[in-house]
Amino acid sequence: MKCAVLFLSVIALVHIFVVEAEEEPDSDALVPQERACLARGETCKDDCECCDCDNQCYCPFDWFGGKWHPVGCSCAHANQYFCDHKKEKCKKA
């Protein structure tokens, strides 16, 4: 009798793992969705990627004319002059 209970317990345990494995989605199936714009503090490559008019893509160590950024760039606060410049630069075509 004990053997039958043990056997059924093992069958139930195997069934639980099989069902859980079927319910998990593949990591390849999960596609990251791109945001329309980046919030302040997030990593960026261009001013047009940053949300709002008063945010710019700021690179603290902008060496070699913008071709190499050892620390990286992030969206940061800008002034009103930059806001006007960004409107012209980032017009939607």
UniProtKB/Swiss-Prot annotation:
GO CC terms: extracellular region
Location in or out of the cell: Secreted
This protein's record includes keyword Transferase: no
Chief location bin: secreted
UniProt superkingdom: Eukaryota
Similarity annotation: Belongs to the neurotoxin 09 (Tx3-6) family.
Domain notes: The presence of a 'disulfide through disulfide knot' structurally defines this protein as a knottin.
The protein, known as: U11-ctenitoxin-Pn1a
Native species: Phoneutria nigriventer (Brazilian armed spider)
